[in-house]
């Protein structure tokens, strides 16, 4: 679907990487632009090489000297030959390097430039450093998490703000590419992760203003709960009444039907489910619409045999960028030659000065 679309990824760590992975899975040629001698910090973090490989499969890597005239010249030629640029710096960083949207669109008016930021460049927090946990905390979603034994909100096991920002950015990029077909012009996009996660709980804010409590989807309902069984856990998400009635029928307690939202029923359901194994309950619910599934470990998911990793189906196919993740600068020569740089220009743009390698 995106064959022929070239994406330059200047970002680091998770948000930009997952955004451009989604685009790569749809056929885009994603070029990770890294600083010569350094590369993405993820490469050097504990477990980083494994995570880097998962996030950058099928992409290409170019290593350049960002802070030199030769490096800038190479970047301008890359931009002139590309469709999309993704970056994840704090507002103003790319501009200080002479690589902001206003600088680059002079070399490519059709460029779609997407900045994935922590906080809006137009807001009071624009210069504040932050990561996923900070955005979840300030925007409100962290306060909605279940509490730990110490009384603190539980930290989600996945980086929800990072991934939400990535998906939102990919959606915005696709919309801008569609718009470009009609206008022949690109545009600058900004995706502040703080704003993304706050938008997820708009209905909670509406309820708070109206003093209306919404559904407790954090384990306070018997119909939406994680139950312990003999050898693991079983998830029940029977929010709609027909699903809940089916659930009650399978466990042999149709009398619990009227108590779908009665928290006192949780212990009764738990006592029924606990003696049997997870597989026994899976077999009992087979073919019954009750929204009941086992809670699988990562190892069990890998062994399950269900195709993984491609969030979009195209007429039954699972598009997926193929090939291993690139080593630092692995495709520099090839990509820069494709963009028309001479051997001398390539050499000048790629040699890492001692102060840049530190």
Feature roles, as predicted:
Residues 1-185, 327, 333-358:
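N-terminal helix-loop segment corresponding to the beta1-alpha1 unit
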Residues 30-33, 286-300, 342-347:
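Short, well-structured beta-strand/strand-turn elements
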Residues 37, 118-120, 193-198, 231, ...:
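Glycine-rich beta-alpha junction loops
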Residues 43-53, 214, 295-335:
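Active-site-adjacent capping/gating segments
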Residues 154-164, 215, 221-224, 233-235, ...:
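A short glycine-threonine-serine/GTX helix/turn-capping micro-motif
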Residues 177-214:
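Substrate-binding/catalytic subdomain of NAD(P)-dependent oxidoreductase enzymes
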Residues 211, 218-288, 292:
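Aromatic-enriched alpha-helical interface/lid elements that frame and gate functional surfaces
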Residues 257-271, 295-304, 344-358:
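Short linear loop/turn motifs
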């Amino acid at each position: 679907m995106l064959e022929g679309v070239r994406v330059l990824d200047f970002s680091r760590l998770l948000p930009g990487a997952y955004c451009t992975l989604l685009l790569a899975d749809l056929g885009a040629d994603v070029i990770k632009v890294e600083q010569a001698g350094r590369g993405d910090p993820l490469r050097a973090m504990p477990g980083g090489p494994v995570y880097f490989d998962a996030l950058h499969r099928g992409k290409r890597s170019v290593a350049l000297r960002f802070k030199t005239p030769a490096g800038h010249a190479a970047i301008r030629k890359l931009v002139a030959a590309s469709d999309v640029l993704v970056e994840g710096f704090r507002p103003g960083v790319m501009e200080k390097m002479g690589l902001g949207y206003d600088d680059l669109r002079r070399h490519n008016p059709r460029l779609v430039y997407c900045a994935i930021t922590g906080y809006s460049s137009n807001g009071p927090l624009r210069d504040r450093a932050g990561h996923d946990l900070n955005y979840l905390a300030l925007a409100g979603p962290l306060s909605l998490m279940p509490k730990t034994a110490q009384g603190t909100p539980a930290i989600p096991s996945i980086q929800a703000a990072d991934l939400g920002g990535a998906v939102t950015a990919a959606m915005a990029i696709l919309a801008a590419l569609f718009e470009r077909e009609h206008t022949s012009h690109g545009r600058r996009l900004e995706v502040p992760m703080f704003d993304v996660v706050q938008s997820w709980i708009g209905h909670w804010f509406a309820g708070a203003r109206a003093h209306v409590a919404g559904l407790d989807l954090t384990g306070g309902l018997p119909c939406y709960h994680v139950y312990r069984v003999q050898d693991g856990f079983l998830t029940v998400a029977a929010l709609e009444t027909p699903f809940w009635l089916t659930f009650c029928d399978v466990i042999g307690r149709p009398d619990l039907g009227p108590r779908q939202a009665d928290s006192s029923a949780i212990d009764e359901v738990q006592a029924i489910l606990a003696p049997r194994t997870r597989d026994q309950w899976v077999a009992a619910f087979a073919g019954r619409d009750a929204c009941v599934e086992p809670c699988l470990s990562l190892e069990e998911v890998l062994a399950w045999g269900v195709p993984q990793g491609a969030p979009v189906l195209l007429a039954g196919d699972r598009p997926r960028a193929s090939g291993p993740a690139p080593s630092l600068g692995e495709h520099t020569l090839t990509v820069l030659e494709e963009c028309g740089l001479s051997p001398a220009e390539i050499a000048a743009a790629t040699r890492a000065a001692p102060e840049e390698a530190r």
